[in-house]
């Protein structure tokens, strides 16, 4: 057996590295083992020397121990080598020069790119690992010490906010207005170009999934040094106040206000639909309409119906499809327009009218509707805790009849305290037309009930049987009975006894405080009672008794409404004008068993918050 074979027989790897001391000792052991093996081979019979066999086992054990030590040493050396490599990589990384960043301006066919970096426009090469064709304009790129593009980043997410004035003809540039009304032309980054390409350009034809187009007045994130706009920033404070839509409300949905509807159609629709006739007669269309009257009588509903009707009529004049009629109804939530910071309310008003002019420039009618107009345009000088109206009112006046003017824009205001609105707003030439939306009388109430009680409603079999199954006659009788009950001057319908400043007294009935909203509430309450009746008895259908019970419940709930510190203010809000009221006594005798209550007011109370 050779030396290498004997080494492998003892479990020592042929190529295992050993220290000098271990190698010498191992070589001595090998020689001793060779001598002992020769002695064993020369021995004859069964009396082989046991000492030699024992020595061999000891030598083998020692060889195994040395092999284990050698294996452990190899693992230690391997770990040390890996740590050295990691440290070398860290040293190399820390020793690298800093990288720069820039904004990509353009790409070229020879794999070079134009980059704006460190205030300079430079043409640079791309690393072989970068596909220059995949880079997008306006994208952030990383540069090494040799000014080579080595990595593509995202689009810039911080910068200045500028307002879009207009998109230039090529669709890739825009005119924006920055701080201090400074105008500049900037490039549009690729995400904005996808939104904003004009429909006539070839790049826009196949883009069916692009977001909505940019429009003048949008806020853009701009890098003024690189000359790029990256993103459209929503204007939350204005978007929350402005609702752009064509309301799905028509004049047919409004009951009991035919005279007022005719007035507002004459004021709004005629100037838009017959501009030539107005020019021929040198007649100036009204700039605004004021709808005033008690709460719940349909002021907001009429304003929505005006926008809907005007859009359809304009579509007919242009020969467009009525289903694709387009108009804009900017619904301004009056109290939310107020802002505690100086100048913010005025700025919001400017933005609203700027948006209206932008829409109207397309030739589309725009209605700016101010609900609760008295809350933001109070008479100047009447403020107690603030004087915001001294600047807000002039801002509205300048927008209505300023130098720029309003073309295709009409302002509609709604209020139940028209006496609190500044007189300068109500003068002719501003809100020219003033339409009072009165409380419904018995005839108007029948019209309103007919909008809610239709022949499609399920009617109880017993009520139908009284009219030989004629559903139309049954519904008509229901409406007549419920209107008679609501407008009857009986003791159960007495509501208030008011005392005027001159000592006169007057008994007022619930019919004096009816409104379209109350009628809708009565019908809804009756329908709910009909549903409960189905669940309890299993007999479906609406009954006249459900409506009569609902009237009693509705009147009883209104018992606490006049409980106010100042009866005269409450009466004005409710639509009661004339002599000042100093004393109110409730006369409700419905389901409530409590005694009637009186509300008095003292004179010279002064102003209160």
Swiss-Prot record:
Result of altering residue 235 to E: Impairs Mpa hexamerization
Residue ranges of coiled coil: 20-96
GO biological process entries: cellular response to nitric oxide; modification-dependent protein catabolic process; proteasomal protein catabolic process; proteasomal ubiquitin-independent protein catabolic process; protein unfolding; response to nitrosative stress; symbiont defense to host-produced reactive oxygen species; symbiont-mediated perturbation of host defenses
InterPro entries, alphabetized: AAA+_ATPase, AAA_ATPase_domain, ATPase_AAA_core, ATPase_AAA_CS, NA-bd_OB-fold, P-loop_NTPase, Prot_ATP_ID_OB_2nd, Prot_ATP_ID_OB_N
Consequence when changing residue 372 to A: Severely reduces ATPase activity. Abolishes protection against RNI
Segments of this protein annotated with the region Docks into pockets in the proteasome alpha-ring: 608-609
UniProt-annotated stretches for the region Disordered: 1-24
Residues that coordinate or bind ATP: 296-301
Documented effect of changing residue 608 to E/F: Abolishes proteasome substrate degradation and protection against RNI
Keywords for the protein's UniProt record, in alphabetical order: ATP-binding, Chaperone, Coiled coil, Isopeptide bond, Nucleotide-binding, Proteasome, S-nitrosylation, Ubl conjugation, Virulence
Keyword ATP-binding listed: yes
Family membership noted in the UniProt record: Belongs to the AAA ATPase family.
Miscellaneous: Was identified as a natural substrate of the M.tuberculosis proteasome.
Domain-level remarks: Consists of three main regions, an N-terminal coiled-coil domain (residues 1-96) that binds to protein Pup and functions as a docking station, an interdomain (residues 97-245) involved in Mpa hexamerization, and a C-terminal ATPase domain of the AAA type (residues 246-609).
Protein name (database record): Proteasome-associated ATPase
Natural source organism: Mycobacterium tuberculosis (strain ATCC 25618 / H37Rv)
């Amino acid at each position: 057996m050779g030396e290498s074979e004997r080494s492998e027989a003892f479990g020592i790897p042929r190529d295992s590295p050993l220290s000098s001391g271990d190698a010498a000792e191992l070589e001595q052991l090998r020689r001793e083992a060779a001598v002992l093996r020769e002695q064993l081979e020369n021995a004859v019979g069964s009396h082989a020397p046991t000492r030699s066999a024992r020595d061999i086992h000891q030598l083998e054990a020692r060889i195994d121990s040395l092999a284990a030590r050698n294996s452990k040493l190899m693992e230690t050396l391997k770990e040390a080598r890996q740590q050295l490599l990691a440290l070398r990589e860290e040293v190399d990384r820390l020793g690298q020069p800093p990288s720069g960043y820039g904004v990509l301006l353009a790409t070229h066919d020879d794999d070079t790119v134009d980059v704006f970096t460190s205030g300079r426009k430079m043409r640079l090469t791309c690393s072989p690992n970068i596909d220059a064709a995949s880079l997008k304009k306006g994208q952030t790129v990383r540069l090494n010490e040799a000014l080579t593009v080595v990595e593509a980043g995202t689009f810039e997410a911080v910068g200045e906010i500028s307002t879009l004035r207009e998109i230039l003809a090529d669709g890739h540039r825009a005119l924006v207005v920055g701080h201090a009304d400074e105008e500049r032309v900037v490039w549009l980054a690729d995400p904005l170009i996808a939104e904003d390409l004009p429909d006539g350009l070839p790049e826009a034809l196949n883009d069916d999934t692009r977001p909505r187009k940019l429009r003048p007045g949008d806020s853009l994130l701009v890098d003024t040094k690189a000359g790029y706009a990256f993103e459209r920033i929503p204007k939350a404070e204005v978007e929350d106040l402005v609702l752009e839509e064509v309301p799905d409300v028509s004049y047919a949905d409004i009951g009991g206000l035919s005279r007022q509807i005719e007035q507002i159609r004459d004021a709004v629709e005629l100037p838009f639909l017959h501009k030539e006739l107005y020019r021929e007669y040198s007649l100036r269309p009204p700039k605004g309409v004021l709808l005033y009257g008690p709460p719940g009588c349909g002021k907001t509903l009429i304003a929505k119906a005006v926008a809907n009707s005007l859009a359809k009529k304009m579509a007919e004049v242009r020969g467009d499809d009525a289903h694709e009629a387009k108009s804009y109804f900017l619904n301004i939530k009056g109290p939310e327009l107020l802002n505690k910071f100086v100048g913010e309310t005025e700025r919001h008003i400017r933005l609203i009218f700027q948006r209206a002019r932008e829409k109207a420039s397309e030739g589309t009618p725009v209605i700016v509707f101010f609900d609760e107009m008295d809350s933001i345009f109070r008479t100047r000088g009447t403020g107690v805790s603030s004087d915001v109206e001294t600047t807000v009112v002039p801002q509205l006046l300048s927008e209505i009849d300023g130098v720029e003017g309003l073309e295709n824009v009409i302002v509609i205001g709604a209020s139940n305290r028209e006496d609190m609105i500044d007189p300068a707003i109500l003068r002719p030439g501003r809100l020219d037309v003033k339409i009072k939306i009165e409380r419904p009388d018995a005839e108007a109430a029948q019209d309103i009930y007919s909008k809610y009680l239709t022949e499609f409603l399920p009617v109880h079999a017993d009520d139908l049987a009284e009219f030989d199954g004629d559903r139309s006659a049954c519904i008509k009788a229901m409406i007549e009975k419920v209107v008679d009950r609501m407008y009857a001057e009986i003791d159960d319908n007495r509501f208030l006894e008011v005392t005027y400043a001159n000592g006169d007294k007057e008994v007022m009935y619930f019919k004096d405080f009816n409104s379209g909203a109350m009628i809708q509430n009565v019908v809804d309450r009756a329908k709910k009672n009909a549903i409960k009746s189905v669940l309890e008895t299993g007999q479906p259908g609406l009954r006249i008794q459900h409506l009569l019970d609902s009237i009693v419940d509705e009147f009883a709930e209104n018992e606490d409404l006049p409980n106010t510190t100042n009866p005269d203010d409450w009466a004005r809000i409710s639509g009661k004008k004339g002599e000042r009221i100093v004393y109110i006594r409730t006369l409700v005798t419905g389901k409530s068993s409590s005694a009637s209550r009186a509300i008095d007011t003292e004179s010279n109370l002064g102003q209160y918050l």
